[in-house]
Amino acid sequence: MGVILFAFHASLFTSCGHKEPNHYTHEVLNRMTPIKDQGDSPTCWIYAMLAAIETEHLAWGDSVNLSPYYIEKMMEREPNLPEDKRGMGATLLRLIQKYGIVGYNAMRSIETPVPKYAFMAGAEYTTQEFARSVCKPDEYIALTANDEEPYYQEVDIVLPDNWLNDRFYNVPIDTLLKKTERAVRQHHGVCWEDEEHAMAIVGIAHDDGGHRYFIMKNSWGTDGPYGGLEYISYKNFRRNTVAVEMTKEAYGLP
C-alpha cells in the first residue's frame, strides 16, 4: 500500500452520493500514540501496522512508540524490495521479526544512524529481542475477504504490494467486518488496507443518521479536519477492504 491520491481519498472517505457528515459520535476510541506523518514516503503500511501494534500494547498498559524509519531503512537490504517501497501489514510483521525494531525516539528520521540496540525501562535489548517483546512470532493473523477463493483457508493476494508472498486467511466480508468490530470494541489494535492505502483502526463512531464508521488513525500528520483521524463507513469497509491484520486473540483464536 502506498500514498493514496486525493481524488481516491475523497471518494473513499465519503458515502457514495452523499456529503460527508460533519459530526460523528464516538462509541469507542482506543488509546493510540501521537499521529505521525509519512511525508512523501509510500510506506503507509509500515505506519499502519506499527500503530496497530502500539494500540495493542497501550490496551495492556504498556507504553510503546515504534520507529517507522528503522524498518524503512532496514528493508533496503531486501533483494525483492519494490522500487516504490510499497508493502502490506503482513510485510511489516515479517520484516520486524527479521530485522527487529526500535523505539521512535531512537530513530526519528530516515537520516538518523540505524541503532544497534533498543532500550526500554532502562534495559538494553538487541533490536530482534525488542521486536519479539512487542510482537511475538505468529502473534498476528492476516485476513482477507475474497469471494472468488475458498473461505476458511489461506489464500494468496496477488498484488505487487505482497512481494514477500504472504498468505491470508480468507473469510466472508460479513465475518471480517464483525471480527474487526469486535476486536476494536475489545480495545485491540487492527491494521486495515485497501489497494491504495493502509491505516490503523482505533475506534468506532456513528453519524447523525445512525450510520457506523471505523475511526482510522492516518499517517498524514494532524492538519486534516479531524486532527489526523479519518472515518471509513462500514459500507466502504465492505467495498474496499483488501486485508486486515489483528492478533489471533483479537480474532478469537487460542
Label every PLM stretch briefly.
Residues V64-V134:
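Papain-like cysteine protease catalytic cores
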